UniProtKB/Swiss-Prot annotation:
Record-listed NAD(+) binding positions: D48, A49, D50, Y51, D52, S97, L98, E129, R152, E189, K307, K331
Annotated catalysed reactions: NAD(+) + (deoxyribonucleotide)n-3'-hydroxyl + 5'-phospho-(deoxyribonucleotide)m = (deoxyribonucleotide)n+m + AMP + beta-nicotinamide D-nucleotide
Domain (BRCT) ranges: 637-714
Protein name: DNA ligase
Lineage: Bacteria, Pseudomonadati, Pseudomonadota, Alphaproteobacteria, Hyphomicrobiales
Family to which the UniProt record says this protein belongs: Belongs to the NAD-dependent DNA ligase family. LigA subfamily.
Residue positions of the active site: K131
Gene name for this UniProt entry: ligA
NCBIfam families on file: dnlj (TIGR00575), PRK07956.1 (NF005932)
Record-level GO cellular component terms: cytosol
Keyword vocabulary terms for this entry: DNA damage, DNA repair, DNA replication, Ligase, Magnesium, Manganese, Metal-binding, NAD, Zinc
Alphabetized InterPro entries for the sequence: BRCT_dom, BRCT_dom_sf, DisA/LigA_HHH, DNA_ligase, DNA_ligase_AS, DNA_ligase_CS, DNAligase_adenylation, DNAligase_N
Length: 714
């Protein structure tokens, strides 16, 4: 594959509908991934500003092409789905996110929109609140007693953390106010004081446990513990500032400000900095004052939230898809400091991604000592943003530069500016490595991507464990008794470094002595070796899938296997295609044949050729092939009753396994799909068939029992 410079993202006005559709798909996937990292994993991967830029471009494209708007788009949803491990809780009133303002003008525009919507001549009273950087929480009280606590989750469904919340001293188990609704959902933010965070991290480090990146992550991670005792040991705090369902309000003509006072009477801690403003100037003055005090505050804030004070106005204003019209968040710029970038190191992730990391002269940013900063990728170093537009006015980053570092969103240290006046005249530009620093294999960058990846999939130590886990997975070699746990153990001991090593374990066991391992004995070792031997004969599609080539899943592996038919033909074609690679592209007949396979295309074809262009991969595969036999593909029949038909299997099958049914259908020339559509020809329904059966009936698709299917295929 040829490395190509990332081109600037096209102006939205110039986007065609097909290109807009592709970019929306890319943006939605990126945002969903970052939402999961933030809301589920408590480990954000990019700065708030970069995330906000992705969202703004998504929303702008959707505004131009409203017909491409999807109900599942991040612009229409909030947060991320609840993580596994906690019971799910449905919020009676959704916990939506807030729209953002990034300038004084945008705050003024927010107030003007409110006035126009309500047809007011005067500016309505606005409550200004510090935006606490923590974890949103909803508390349900019935007859004044706490009955349930839930995280925000995706805004509609959260995680039940009631037991953990009962350990937080700031949260009353019984409301104390004179007037208490029969049922109410009270909301706020779980957070950790800065000095408590530093003390916790010190204890974690001394104990050899994970240290947290910032107070927000520590608060979220502490609350979402399966062991309540761990949560109880953590110094969590809570500010109350909102509510959801209320069976009745505890006052006549309620306002935001009055409700906050009631929350204080009920036993909650309410932020003492909250201020009632009567003009845009008042609101902006509060923003600047609290911003100046930010470093001295005992807790982290990342902005100010403005809310219309009168609740009847809030009710009239209502909501847009994912945020209220009556509130907006005014974000702070990140805290910054100046230091020297001493070195750029390259880290290799488990998927082979080469990620540059800046090693800095230690500097304090926002009260935290920073020594490293993310550089994201080659484009970021060169001064090119994630959307192709210039970063830092297009100025690149070099080893030895004096740089401005910020903790973006008080989370991830990031280089935002280079001080060019201090750059030595002879300082060379940084050259991103085109070889993996771990294994020496060449690195490749796909067109349209910013990431360079190591192509030494089978031999790179940085990727080895994940690749080996994939190699023995169910759809690959599927070796009984050799799962993830065993792979990790054998790799740590140096016994299995590449796939061929699995098949030489038996021959080496006189030296290794697997039977001496804890949990093993002569019988279990004998059974393991028998299971390995049983997989010395493998179907071509399973082998191709097992190689872990990027973009080659189960379906593409089958397409390749059917096209080439045998391992010898496949290898000869791949070697010829790899030899045809040139800086100008690949015009070899072998590559064109690969690229023209129905369902493959450029992206998959280039990934396959990159794999075989790396000699170390070929060497590892040759070593594997000396230990196994690859079975030729049984060509699908074309003269059967189901040849060319699309079939979906659903429900519990009793006469064959799902894999057996799928394989039999494919041998007879049918295409097996995972979902029902108008293009589906048959749905084979077993016991307890659910939504797929219902959809098939709604669409008029032919539904067969197992017996009817067997009769059809003879």
């Amino acid at each position: 594959m040829i490395s190509k410079s990332k081109t600037a993202a096209p102006d939205i006005d110039k986007l065609t509908k097909p290109k807009a559709k592709v970019e929306l798909m890319r943006l939605r996937l990126a945002i969903e991934g970052h939402d999961k990292a933030y809301y589920q994993d408590d480990a954000p991967k990019i700065p708030d500003a970069d995330y906000d830029a992705l969202r703004r471009r998504l929303e702008a494209i959707e505004a131009k092409f409203p017909e491409l708007l999807s109900a599942s788009s991040p612009s229409q949803t909030v947060g991320a789905a609840p993580a596994r491990g906690f019971s799910k809780v449905q919020h009676a009133v959704p916990m939506l996110s807030l729209g953002n303002a990034f300038s004084d003008d945008e705050v003024g525009e927010f107030v003007e929109r409110v006035q126009r919507f309500l047809k007011l001549e005067d500016i309505p009273a606005i409550v200004a609140e510090p935006k606490i950087d923590g974890l949103s929480l909803s508390l349900r009280y019935e007859n004044g007693t706490l009955v349930r606590a839930a995280t925000r989750g995706d805004g509609f469904t959260g995680e039940d953390v009631t037991a953990n919340v009962r350990t937080i001293a700031d949260i009353p188990t019984t409301l104390k106010a004179k007037t208490i609704p029969a049922a109410c959902e009270l909301r706020g933010e779980v957070y950790m004081l800065k000095h408590d965070f530093l003390a916790l991290n010190k204890r974690q480090e001394e104990a050899g446990d994970t240290v947290f990146a910032n107070p927000r992550n520590s608060a979220a991670g502490s609350l979402r513990q399966k062991d309540v005792a761990i949560t109880a040991s953590r110094p969590l705090k809570f500010f109350a500032y909102a509510w959801g369902e209320m069976s009745d309000y505890p006052m006549e003509s309620p306002t935001q400000h009055a409700m906050l006072a009631w929350l204080g009477d009920a036993g909650f801690t309410v932020n003492p900095e909250i201020t009632l403003c009567h003009s845009v100037d008042d609101a902006l003055a509060f923003y600047r004052r609290i911003g100046e005090q930010r470093a001295a505050l005992p807790y982290d804030i990342d902005g100010v939230v403005y809310k219309v004070d009168r609740l009847d106005y809030q009710a009239r204003l209502g909501f847009v898809s994912r945020s209220p019209r009556w509130a907006i968040a005014h974000k702070f710029a990140a805290e910054q400091a100046v230091t020297v970038l001493e070195k750029i190191d390259i880290q290799v992730g488990r998927t082979g991604a080469l990620t540059p990391v800046a090693r800095l002269q230690p500097v304090t940013v926002g009260g935290v000592v920073v020594q490293n900063a993310t550089l994201h990728n080659e484009d970021y170093i060169k001064g090119v943003g994630s959307d192709g537009s210039p970063l830092r006015d297009g100025v690149d980053i070099r080893e030895g530069d004096t740089v401005v570092v910020q903790r973006a969103g008080d989370v991830i240290p990031q280089i935002v500016t280079v001080v060019l006046d201090k750059r030595p005249a002879d300082l060379p530009a940084y050259k991103f490595p085109h070889k993996c620093p771990v294994c020496g294999s060449h690195a490749a960058r796909e067109e349209g991507e910013a990431v360079w990846r190591c192509t030494g999939a089978l031999i790179c130590p940085a990727q080895a464990v994940e690749r080996l886990k994939h190699f023995v997975s169910r759809l690959a070699f599927d070796i009984d008794g050799l799962g993830e746990k065993q792979i990790v153990l054998f790799h740590e001991r140096g016994w299995v470094r590449e796939p061929a090593d699995i098949f030489t374990l038996k021959a080496r066991n006189a030296e290794l002595k697997l039977e001496d391992l804890e949990g093993y004995g002569e019988t279990s070792v004998r059974n393991l070796f028998a299971a390995i031997d049983a997989r010395r004969n493998i179907e071509l599609n399973r082998l191709i899938f097992a190689l872990g080539i990027r973009h080659v899943g189960e379906g593409n592996a089958k397409l390749l296997a059917r096209h080439y038919g045998s391992i010898d033909v496949f290898l000869a074609a791949m070697r010829a295609a790899a030899e045809g690679q040139t800086p100008e592209g690949n015009t070899s007949e072998a590559y064109q044949d690969l690229d023209n396979i129905a369902g493959i295309g450029d992206v998959v074809a280039e990934a396959v050729v990159e794999f075989f262009a790396e000699p170390r991969n070929v060497g590892a595969l040759d070593a594997l092939l000396r230990e196994i036999e690859v079975l030729p593909v049984e060509q699908a029949k074309q003269d059967t009753a189901v040849a060319g038909k699309t079939v979906v299997f659903t429900g519990a099958l009793t006469k064959f396994t799902r894999d057996e049914a799928k394989a039999a259908a494919e041998r007879l020339g049918a295409k097996v799909a995972g979902s029902v559509s108008k293009k589906t020809d048959y749905v084979v329904a077993g016991e307890d068939a659910g939504s797929k059966l219902t959809k098939a009936r709604d669409l008029g698709v032919a539904v067969l029992t197992e017996d009817e299917w067997l009769a059809l295929i003879g």
